[in-house]
Regions:
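Surface-exposed, charge/polar-rich loops and edge strands
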Residues: 1-161, 165-226
Length: 226
């Protein structure tokens, strides 16, 4: 599969406990998000990185990689009866994907070793939500570590959607809306960030029942220019 490192918009490390409960207002619109960035509550990472995400609690612990995948990876879920146009337009107007979509894939044992090594460093975040689930994030920017993760993901088969199909459909539709706007403006190249969706990729063997979900606003992906 194709899964790449990306520049993330995320809470400032020392203000994450302030930011997460306020995500409803921070992500209510592009102006609010830009205000949070100007205030230092949120930050735009200058460089691309993978993020190792771990959640632990009941019923156990799962570890995944957060990366950007071609938006087509979100297709093929269950048929969506709900109209997702309003949600898609909100994402397109926000210009940011508010949380990673959850995907599962067949991981090799080598990937466990690589991610285990990444988790030996200091974590970027370690927060426990009201449900008692602890969310930890490690940033992977070192060239050799990024290369190792990318090589393993390149060899993995295509992932499967393990998220709300309506959310995935809204992300796909938002991508189409932004592409239509770019085509109408004569600026479309095919390389725009809206052609990718940020995803949390979990090994299928670790996921039983409901897959883990990265909290909204913790790791977001800018899909259009502010």
């Amino acid at each position: 599969m194709k899964a790449l490192p990306f520049p993330c918009i995320r809470p400032a490390q020392d203000r994450v406990l302030e930011a997460l409960p306020a995500m409803g207002s921070i992500l209510s619109g592009n102006d609010a998000l830009r205000g949070a960035i100007a205030d230092g509550l949120m930050l735009k990472d200058p460089g691309a990185a993978y993020y190792v995400y771990e959640c632990s609690g009941e019923p156990g612990r799962v570890t995944g990689v957060v990366a950007i995948c071609p938006v087509g990876a979100l297709a093929g879920g269950d048929a969506v009866a709900a109209d997702t146009t309003a949600a898609a337009r909100a994402i397109a107007d926000l210009k940011v994907q508010p949380r990673p979509a959850t995907l599962v894939y067949e991981a090799s044992p080598v990937m466990d070793i690589i991610l285990g090594a990444a988790k030996e460093g200091a974590s970027l975040y370690a927060v426990t939500d009201p449900a008692g689930i602890t969310h930890r994030v490690w940033e992977v920017k070192r060239e050799d570590a990024v290369g190792a993760i990318r090589a393993m993901l390149d060899q993995a088969p295509e992932p499967a959607l393990a998220d709300d199909p309506a959310y995935a459909a809204a992300l796909v539709e938002a991508s189409q809306l932004l592409a239509d706007d770019a085509r109408a403006a004569g600026t479309y190249t095919g390389k725009e960030p809206f052609n990718f969706a940020v995803a949390a990729l979990f090994p299928a063997a670790q996921v039983s029942g409901g897959a883990a979900q990265v909290p909204t606003g913790l790791l977001t992906h800018q899909v259009a220019r502010f």
